[in-house]
Amino acid sequence: MEDQGHLPSEPRALFDRRDDTDSTNTALDETDLSRTPLQDTSHTPHAEDWSLMPDLKKQHDRNVASGFRRRELGVTWKNLSVDVVSADAAINENVLSQFNIPQHIRESRNKAPLRTILHESHGCVKPGEMLLVLGRPGSGCTTLLRMLSNHRLGYKAIRGDVRFGSLTPEEASKYRGQIVMNTEEELFFPTLTVAQTLDFATRLKVPFNLPDGVTSPEAFRQETREFLLKSMGISHTSDTKVGNEYVRGVSGGERKRVSIIECLATRGSVFCWDNSTRGLDASTALEWAKAVRAMTDVFGLSSIVTLYQAGNGIYDLFDKVLVLDEGKQIYYGPMSQARPFMEEQGFVCREGSNVADFLTGVTVPTERKIRPGYENRFPRNADELLAAYEKSPIRAQMAIEYDYPDTESTRERTEEFKLGVLDEKAKRLSKNSPFTVDFLQQVKACIIRQYQIIWTDKATFAIKQISTVIQALVAGSLFYNAPDNSGGLFIKSGALFFSLLYNSLLAMSEVTDSFSGRPVLIKHKYFAFFHPAAFCIAQIAADIPVLLFQISMFAVVVYFMVGLTTSAGAFFSYWIIIFVATMVMTALFRAIGALFSTFDGASKVSGFLISALIMYCGYLEPYHAMHPWFIWIYWINPLAYAFDALLSIEFHNKIIPCVGNNLVPFGPGYDDTTFQSCAGVGGAVRGMTYVTGDQYLASLTYSYSHVWRNFGILWAWWALFVAVTIIATSRWKSAAEAGNSLLIPRETVAKHHAVVRKDEEAQLNEKAGHKGTGTDSEAQSNVDQHLVRNTSVFTWKNLTYTVKTPSGDRVLLDNVYGWVKPGMLGALMGSSGAGKTTLLDVLAQRKTDGTIRGSIMVDGRPLPVSFQRSAGYCEQLDVHEPFATVREALEFSALLRQPRHIPREEKLKYVDVIIDLLELHDLEHTLIGRVGAGLSVEQRKRVTIGVELVSKPSILIFLDEPTSGLDGQSAFNTVRFLRKLADVGQAVLVTIHQPSAQLFAEFDTLLLLAKGGKMVYFGDIGDNAQTVKDYFARYGAPCPANVNPAEHMIDVVSGHLSQGRDWNQVWLESPEHSSASRELDSIISEAASKPPGTVDDGYEFAMPLWEQTKIVTQRMSTSLYRNCDYIMNKIALHIGSALFNGFSFWMIGDSVADMQLKLFTIFNFIFVAPGVINQLQPLFIERRDIYDAREKKSKMYSWVAFVTALIVSEFPYLCVCAVLYFVCWYYTVGFPSDSDKAGAIFFIMLCYEFLYTGIGQFIAAYAPNATFAALTNPLILGTLVSFCGVLVPYAQIQAFWRYWIYWLNPFNYLMGSMLVFSVFDTDVKCKEGEFAVFDTPNGTTCADYLSTYLQGVGSRANLVNPEATSGCRVCQYRYGSDYLYTINLKDYYYGWRDTAIVCIFVLSSYALVYALMKLRTKASKKAE
């Protein structure tokens, strides 16, 4: 069985280096791999211990035999300084402060303060060397790594010299795939499996020249992938999704290893590893370090590593160490001399401490220990240490290396590197291309991945196809069997318009989709996997079959149900035009997504754009009615060209007889066509009772000759949008490049500055040598006074957890048992993927699927109803509301989770205690933000711990890897605090990955798990871990002296020391197991016989629902108030759409055509919804995911409070939006200025704001992700728009729909109420072309001839010349009410009736948000 913990490097075939010159250059012991002059020759790397070292050497030998060159590149830097804009300058404006123009002008005059985050750093890493960069978070380690991996964007100023071999940074940028950085974050497409993720990486790095014995690129790729998976110990995860915070996948440690593999797959020459052991267990972390050492030795790599918690085993593998503090380089030199140097300055390294922690702690007053006699002369801060280092002989000797880039051997090696890279490249690539495989292979790889992404997110794919079929059937039945006469003109035009509209709305989801995988694509850009054009072409290639299927289903259903021209030529012309138009709209929205760095900006533009394109496509407003100031939009509108082509295909060479209201007069007694004429039909000629299709098209400025011209224009638009997407994609940059800084809300700036000044004064006191012991002791007693005492015993017995997988049931926990008593600090350990997080999830009642068997009890009794909120659980992933400050997040948790009988003031006072304890006072008034813009990973981890601690957990505290991502001092402080909690009676259970010996000694008991969730040990740890050591020694695995027992244990149960033994079986047969089982039974029975230690208050939530709602609504409202992008985009979309709508329908008149325009301007108001909904839903889903991931599971507040807060927090902005739209639109279109009518219409518009928000929220409430929601919107909105009586008037809607869906459609009542108030009292005045003009028989007067008509079917018509005997002029309507009657609005009271019904629909839409949220909310699994 493959050892899980092994993390070998790549096979050497992965690092092909052609050598056409001298084979001696490739020898492992060559002299030019020599270390620094100060290298301690007694230091022997432990890479030889690595189990896969022989395989690595075989690969190396194969490369030598194949004649591969060595690609070696050292890194040298001198006087390197980096400046950024000070964090204090990064102010997060709120909705009101952004309009404070005078303040912005004043601030713009002040030059933004700069902060030096890296100060005159220097160093040299030659091929074959490893450098360890140490420093506390914020000291500049990551910045240095970014400089040394040539990631230079996002900084205000960079000074100094960096050379890669003899290359300058500009020259090295052509080789970005060879100088790579593995960042701290794991960025993947979560729905792809591990194998699919690695397939993609390896496929794009296959060299052109293959090693001897490898038959094909595919064989090389397969060999690479299988070796990497196997060597990293995660072969068993190959078919498991990678996952993320919200998608279940591999464990956190396994995900980190996938990240490492992907980085190794680049086959680079310079590797920068940024805290790459975060989330790995101690044994796996050590194996990874050995792998890097082996790679570096065998292949001459340059490896630069920064680690926060480096055990001595890892530390000893490095050649050099560089220590940073406050950006200053306080040590750089040989690893072996770092500790002696610091000890010479007067610092003492405690016994059992990690040397790395000792080096980073020398400037921390609470961490350092001073040698007797040095109390008054040791360096107290970074400046003094830097001065001491500058005077040391180490500094002078290391400076010798800085000429390395200019040496002849380096220049030769760099030329060799260039040739080696060139040998690997596909021959069709240009010399300066950073890529490895040719463009076609890049496209192929991207296409495969694109189909995998589509297929692994089946729900999104299915909703797109299902909604298309449903919408096609609905639309086909709505426009069913449209007649071939004048009555069918409007219906057929509506059907053709809807064909474009629906597919365009569906394409809007591309904006949402554009942002979902962007961080992954940016990472791959730095890895030089593919050109952005390859990705864009792959998206198109994936689009084509999906869209062909989608459009074919839609076209077949709609075309033949509507009864459009039944000829093959006409059908396929319709089909191809719809397909091309959809391709164009997809490309357009994808380009918009690519052009913007934020989703809010893209959604604002796309929402406004869809309104503009729909309005100016020629359907709502014909070309001749468009105003000159906006008519240019028609000519740049792809939908206009498509609509022109569709109408021309349908009506060309048709004879269209006028019928019904379009024929004047008609009815009994009017059968002679000589004395009839068409009315209200475009292109009608006086005295004619029909119009030809081409006449009708000409009246719209369309022509059949335009069809294929427009087809070509549509493809030209498509090509333009694709080109824009490619250019925009190539300019994407990561969030960190924009400058990673703290964000301070405008309203807390003064508070933050006060805290900063206080900190600066404290630092000055420290530099002056003052000590604050009195204050520290006071704070200490204050903390002790507030800590919670607990008396409950928590037990679990025979716990088994099973989940269903495609290959059958999989056991993740196998008969696990244990307990945590008051005052006990328990450690839960095991290799990555052993089931530690799963066990905590099950114990904390956080699982919503799978099967749990066994018992979980408190005081020998079933878990109380309040358990989930009474037990604190710090999860591994830090999920927080990004627009909350640190203090607000802690107060929110304290107010909602501490018992209801505790006064509010006391809860908030406890928050101050935790802020001091976790040293968060300098961050308390800053926004949490997102990674890259806000708190760092380490700071977020402290906030996560704080959020749980402020809740005063009364039963126990679970912490899942609370020290991952923290530096050694922060990790020790965290565990020391947990120790303190335990000492006052709290029960604490912690999963921990890489504890130092010091850290491990703080724990009382250990539960050790092996692969498959099997128990390996449970019991006391003992002084200096002696009890655990004795147990393993007894079974043949003694812990050597000076080896961290925590690392040793993991190595024994899952690493190369396992000796193939089943340690679970060893445990089950041991006396310790029997003793622990008996003690567990005794604890349960004893606890059950006593009164419970914790009295259950019987409440599921700590606070009443009303209090929950108030607190959560306040947080949501504050969050929206600070989310300027979201609010301003909503406001800008309303103002822009309103002005656009108003000026497009400027001062509408009172003619028959103007009645239609009034209908259409109101109809266009509806289309403000898609843009706002598309922007609203991702925010709703992000909030819901935060709630689902953490707040729901800890019973912080009810889902009812959550939904209420989300709904209510939007209200103020919806009111503002309604006012703005009304003011910008109502008077510009010339609607009645009477206050009663204007007020009524404003009220309806306000109701509509609430209505569409409710619709968007109920879709989002149940949607699994934002893309799914964006694809569902067209189905819902398309149906509502179709049946509101505009596209097809009420009288012509098919009977099946007319009698139910029409009456259940809120848009119907919205349109009806607004039309009644704006049109009912209008006097209709026909324009010249709108009159039906005809002669009378036998010289009778017009009044006499039309008397029967005017008293019957034409009673609403207006005869303007009754006494005339020829040229009778009849207008279709007298008043607006006559027009409204034809669309089923028969009386004025309909306006108020419909208004009331709209209000009812508003309430019902919000009720659906509650219903669907409840339907989606799963209960936690209980043990069976």
UniProtKB/Swiss-Prot annotation:
Keyword Transport tagged: yes
Membrane topology qualifier: Multi-pass membrane protein
Region called Disordered, residue ranges: 1-49, 760-782
Chain sites annotated for binding ATP: G830, S831, S832, G833, A834, G835, K836, T837
Record-linked InterPro entries: AAA+_ATPase, ABC2_TM, ABC_trans_N, ABC_transporter-like_ATP-bd, ABC_transporter-like_CS, ABCG_dom, ABCG_PDR_1, ABCG_PDR_2
Glycosylation sites noted in the Swiss-Prot or TrEMBL record: N79, N275, N790, N798, N1265, N1338
Transmembrane segments: 488-508, 520-540, 544-564, 569-589, 605-625, 629-649, 710-730, 1131-1151, 1161-1181, 1200-1220, 1240-1260, 1268-1288, 1300-1320, 1395-1415
Domain ABC transporter: 96-351, 794-1037
Xref: SMART domains: AAA (SM00382)
Job of this protein: ABC efflux transporter that is able to transport rhodamine 6G (R-6G), a known substrate for many ABC transporters, but seems not to transport azoles.
Family: Belongs to the ABC transporter superfamily. ABCG family. PDR (TC 3.A.1.205) subfamily.
Protein name, entry field: ABC multidrug transporter H
